[in-house]
C-alpha cells in the first residue's frame, strides 16, 4: 500500500462540500468524509472503490 494511505484524513480549509473517501489505517477500511475543495492530502479518493483498490488491497 502506498505511504500516503497512512496520512490522516484532511478535509482542507475551504468551504466546498464534496463527497470523498479516505483510508483509515486503524480500521483497515475506507470511509466517507466531506472535502472542502482545496489543500488536503493524497489520502483522498473520488470513489470508495478507488480507495479500496489503492489502500486496502
Curated annotation (Swiss-Prot):
Q: Check the record and name the Pfam families matching this protein.
A: Kunitz_BPTI
Where does the record place the BPTI/Kunitz inhibitor domain?
5-55
UniProt keyword Transcription, yes or no: no
* PROSITE patterns named in the record: BPTI_KUNITZ_1, BPTI_KUNITZ_2
Q: Which residues cross the membrane?
A: none
What SMART domains does the record point to? KU
UniProt cross-references to InterPro entries, sorted A to Z: Kunitz_BPTI, Kunitz_BPTI_sf, Prtase_inh_Kunz-CS, TFPI/VKTCI-like
Give the source's domain of life in one word: Eukaryota
The record's tissue-specificity note reads: Expressed by the venom gland.
What GO molecular function terms would the record report? serine-type endopeptidase inhibitor activity; toxin activity
Q: Name one GO cellular component term.
A: extracellular space
Keyword annotations for this protein, in alphabetical order, are:
Disulfide bond, G-protein coupled receptor impairing toxin, Secreted, Toxin
Q: What is its main location?
A: secreted
Q: Which family does it belong to?
A: Belongs to the venom Kunitz-type family.
- Function summary: Interacts with vasopressin V2 receptor (V2R/AVPR2), probably in a selective manner. Inhibits vasopressin binding human V2R in the nanomolar range (Ki=13.3 nM), and also moderately inhibits vasopressin-induced cAMP production (IC(50)=453 nM). In vivo, intraperitoneal injection of this protein into rats increases diuresis by 4.5-fold, without any loss of electrolytes.
Free-text comment about domains: Exploits its two major loops and engages more positions in its interaction with V2R. The pharmacophore defined by numerous amino acids positioned in loop 1 (9 to 18) and loop 2 (34, 39 and 44) may be at the origin of the absolute selectivity of this protein for V2R.
Protein name in UniProt: Mambaquaretin-3
Q: What is the source species?
A: Dendroaspis polylepis polylepis
Amino acid at each position: 500500500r502506498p505511504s500516503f494511505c497512512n496520512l490522516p484524513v484532511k478535509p482542507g480549509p475551504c468551504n466546498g462540500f464534496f463527497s470523498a473517501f479516505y483510508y483509515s489505517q486503524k480500521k483497515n477500511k475506507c470511509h466517507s468524509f466531506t472535502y472542502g475543495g482545496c489543500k488536503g492530502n493524497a489520502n483522498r479518493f473520488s470513489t470508495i472503490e478507488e480507495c479500496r483498490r489503492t489502500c486496502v488491497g
